[in-house]
């Protein structure tokens, strides 16, 4: 905060306010400049963070729980719904700068690719999960992300079963999402984590909500 400490040679003015908003979001409005001209730099940042925590999540679209069959019978291809979600994300960036700046950061950390997932409802739930947790506890965030339908699809968690384990997500969990490559974990850790995450592969309809399936869960002891 040293660079923002007001002084005669370093006034807290519109250029500084705009700089703060560019670093914490995607810019500010004239009304923001008017408002925060009466705040200290510390008060400005605290208010931006507090407002982000209080901002409502993006409302669920009517297709938030659709399965593959419902999308296919809707009269629009899936790209149409992907575009709706993309436009909503851009609108959120304009209106909720700080939270969406963090959401953008975390979407580049917990990466999924829409062409690989190819289920708009899964991608909406992924987007909502990031909004809900971008200012929260990282451990909680990681736990929920690992069970998100989009992530289960993208890193093959839905294929992870007791008799045919898939280690893809477990490996990325350590290598990319948490500890970093070669940083204090072993192949055995990956194996045991994959076993602990088996069973999330039951759907009542094709590409509907993914549920836990006790029959494909590895109930053996993990170490």
Regions found by a protein language model. Name each.
Residues 1-55, 148-151, 157-160, 172-175, ...:
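Cell-wall polysaccharide-cleaving catalytic domain and substrate-binding groove, primarily
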Residues 2, 52, 67-68, 83-86, ...:
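Active-site substrate-binding loop specific to GH73 endo-beta-N-acetylglucosaminidase modules
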Residues 4, 21, 26, 39, ...:
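Phenylalanine-focused residue identity feature
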Residues 6, 20, 57-60, 100, ...:
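Generic detection of intrinsically disordered/low-complexity segments and helix-coil linkers/edges
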Residues 7-16, 93-98, 184-188:
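Structural motif
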Residues 16, 23, 28-131:
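N-terminal accessory alpha/beta regions
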């Amino acid at each position: 905060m040293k660079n923002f400490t007001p002084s005669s040679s370093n006034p807290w003015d519109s250029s500084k306010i705009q700089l703060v908003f560019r670093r914490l979001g995607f810019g500010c409005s004239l009304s923001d400049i008017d408002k925060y001209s009466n705040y200290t730099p510390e008060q400005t940042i605290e208010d931006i963070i507090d407002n982000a925590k209080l901002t409502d999540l993006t409302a669920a679209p009517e297709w938030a729980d659709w399965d593959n069959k419902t999308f296919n019978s809707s009269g629009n291809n899936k790209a149409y719904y992907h575009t709706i979600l993309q436009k909503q994300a851009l609108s959120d960036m304009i209106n909720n700068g700080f939270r969406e700046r963090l959401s953008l950061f975390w979407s580049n950390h917990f990466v999924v690719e829409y062409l690989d997932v190819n289920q708009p409802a899964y991608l909406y739930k992924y987007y909502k999960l990031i909004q809900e947790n971008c200012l929260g506890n990282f451990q909680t965030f990681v736990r929920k992300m690992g069970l998100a339908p989009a992530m289960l699809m993208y890193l093959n968690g839905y294929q992870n079963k007791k008799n045919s384990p898939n280690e893809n997500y477990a490996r990325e969990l350590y290598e990319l999402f948490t500890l970093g490559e070669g940083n204090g974990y072993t192949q055995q850790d990956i194996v045991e984590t994959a076993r602990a995450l088996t069973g999330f592969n039951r759907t009542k309809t094709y590409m509907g909500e993914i549920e836990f399936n006790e029959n494909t869960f590895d109930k053996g002891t993990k170490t």
